[in-house]
């Protein structure tokens, strides 16, 4: 039994045809790491930095886990990790809008995720509901189960084979979310050091434009639901 054959094939593609895409994802992680490093420097004497470092590190962990699952062609299951990723991303927004809110986290009295999303004017309600219905909880919905079924033989797949096109698409989805987190990292840093935040934001903007081109995100966004495959 080879549990890693799909991941190995994905990694081979990332070292060849998708090398630019791999570098874009790695650059996003590097920008996020710089944010964690910044907060670590200030954490000993600053609660905002400690709480933001924790939120950013947790978001990074979930994204890293999702990355590995995507390489295994388990992107649907990786959605279960993107739900808490989104919560930590929105927590960073919540704290940046009012830094005094970090005391709520320190005292374990944060409002519910839905309430926080409402307070920050989150645009991700639909995405959150999709993840809840199809990824974060047990479900027999079409979106949850379709990849498990071999419709030719009507049998249940034990594993997911390597598939280049879904890999490219799913990595693009991950990159888009990492780019959002990189921008929010810059905003969160700017609360403590405006210039450092500006520098990070400029690099995040460059990453968004370059990586977005590598993943053809504009082309994907321009497609209407009727024209999408």
What are these regions (language model features)?
Residues 1-56, 62-65, 69-81, 103-229:
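A cross-kingdom marker of C-terminal helix-rich interaction/assembly modules
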Residues 81-82, 89:
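Internal, conserved structured core segments that host functional sites
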Residues 34, 87-103:
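Short, charge-rich amphipathic alpha-helical segments embedded
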């Amino acid at each position: 039994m080879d549990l890693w054959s799909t991941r190995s094939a994905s990694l081979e593609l990332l070292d060849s045809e998708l090398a630019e895409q791999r570098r874009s994802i790695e650059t996003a992680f590097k920008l996020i790491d710089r944010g964690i490093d910044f907060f670590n420097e200030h954490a000993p004497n600053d609660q905002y930095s400690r709480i933001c470092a924790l939120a950013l590190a947790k978001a990074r962990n979930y994204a890293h886990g999702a990355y590995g699952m995507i390489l295994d062609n388990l992107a649907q299951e990786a959605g279960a990790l993107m739900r808490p990723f989104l919560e930590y991303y929105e927590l960073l927004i919540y704290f940046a809008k009012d830094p005094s809110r970090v005391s709520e986290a320190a005292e374990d009295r944060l409002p519910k995720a839905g309430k926080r999303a409402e307070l920050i004017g989150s645009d991700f309600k639909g995405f959150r509901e999709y993840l809840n219905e199809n990824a974060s909880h047990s479900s027999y919905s079409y979106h949850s189960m379709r990849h498990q079924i071999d419709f030719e033989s009507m049998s249940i797949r034990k594993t997911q084979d390597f598939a280049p096109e879904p890999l490219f698409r799913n990595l693009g989805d991950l990159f888009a979310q990492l780019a959002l987190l990189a921008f929010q990292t810059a905003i969160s840093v700017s609360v403590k050091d405006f210039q450092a935040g500006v520098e990070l934001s400029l690099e995040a903007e460059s990453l968004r434009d370059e990586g977005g081109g590598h993943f053809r995100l504009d082309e994907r966004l321009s497609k209407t639901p009727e024209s999408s495959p």
